[in-house]
């Protein structure tokens, strides 16, 4: 179950998700503090569901160079205060394809437990999220870079089952 940023403080929904006994991905609200984010997770767990994964996806600021501002300082703060795993969504966290790779690398370096990245074989024709989606071959390259960073910060990444870069628009054909 994924609870998006706009529903992070929908307490009835959080409690219901807690009763579902399914893993819940909880995205941080657009202006939520660290405490509010963790307390939203508590609503889910108060119903007996401890399968909660947190996701930092950016907060609203006055910056105009990006759609949201990805708060990577949240990662070590959550890890200091909670046992819950925390992912980073650099796609929604920036809203811009060219920022996904560098912020993914930074998220891994700061200790994120995982990434949620938009990947599309032809982002310019995607029905949604195309502007923030990377191409499959870019994802392949990102994973190579992330593996190197993960090794430096002593994190483990499982080996992929298969490469997602099949059936993609060749780099030369991109706008």
Residue ranges and their predicted role:
Residues 122-155:
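C-terminal helical cap(s) of enzyme catalytic domains, especially alpha/beta-barrels
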Residues 18, 41-45, 76-82, 143, ...:
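Surface-exposed amphipathic alpha-helices with a cationic face
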Residues 143-175:
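Surface-exposed amphipathic alpha-helical tracts and adjacent flexible/coil segments at the periphery
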Residues 7-19, 153:
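Active-site loop-to-helix "anion-binding N-cap" substructures in soluble metabolic enzymes
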Residues 43-110:
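Active-site/ligand-binding-proximal alpha/beta "capping" segment
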Residues 4-9, 109-132:
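Glycine-rich phosphate-binding active-site loops on the catalytic face of alpha/beta enzymes
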Residues 1-11, 23-34, 53-57, 65-66:
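Catalytic beta/alpha-barrel core
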